[in-house]
Amino acid sequence: MEGRSVQENGKDSSNGKDSSNGKGQRRSRHSRPGNVDLNGAPAIVSETHPLAMVYGGGGIFGIGYCVGVAHGLAEGGIPVATAPALGTSAGSWAASAVALGTPYEDIVNLEAPPIPNRTSGVLARIARELFGEATHPLVSVSAVTVRTRRRHILDGGHYPLADLVAASSAVPGLLPPHRIDGRLYVDGGMWSATSVDAAAKSKSVIVVAPLAGPHMGPIGRGAGYLLGRELHAWKARHRDRHISLIRPSRAIARYAGVNPMNLFDADRGRAVYPLAYEQGLRMAAEIRDKVAV
């Protein structure tokens, strides 16, 4: 469990002009309801929630890890299902599943697509098997536009969750981009594996980061360094609030191995779930008195 985050000055890097909306939140000229171009700026939310969740990327391994931790936290008395949740890549599946109360058995029974896969709409088709056309106002996801390479935060109250997870999980070179409102999006992890700075405004934040930490090898060390910067900036911005970091233990990290393609192994995702559940249950006991619920 750690604390840290990232910041932005609200200026357009191409011309130096201030392109924020006056609140520190950047909006493009073509912003739509439910689609905010943050490009690194901290999220501005009118309502302050007791708790917000952030679920990071990590392939099918990451889905199993995030959902397992979330279910363990819930069993331990942390109200993750009613907290606004931001998901990136694998984390977008977890955020959606937890908010909708989707049983983990339904997730693991989905047929994972072969990787790499160029079939247009493959992720959306699988996601619709799980989520249908459901929307949910507490879910948002991070995705990156193909044309501008800027991060957008997409609101699950405005778009079907199936489309959001397809956009946020479209790993370049492995899975095809997904189109929403005429824009092509790829994996939000191209910007940040977690996007802690875009978490909903809240008194407490819990970050579940499947890729971060020394036990995850070179990828984990790199992801952990970047996440550390995000957490540090978050704490500097929110000195009166609490943030908790949950990342894989050594035993859990062994399921990922050293080959990055292991992250897309469905069997590893299934195997990691019960261990992640137990970790979430333990963490609930540790952080319960620090989390505003």
Which ranges hold each PLM region?
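Patatin-like phospholipase
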Residues: 1-88, 94-293
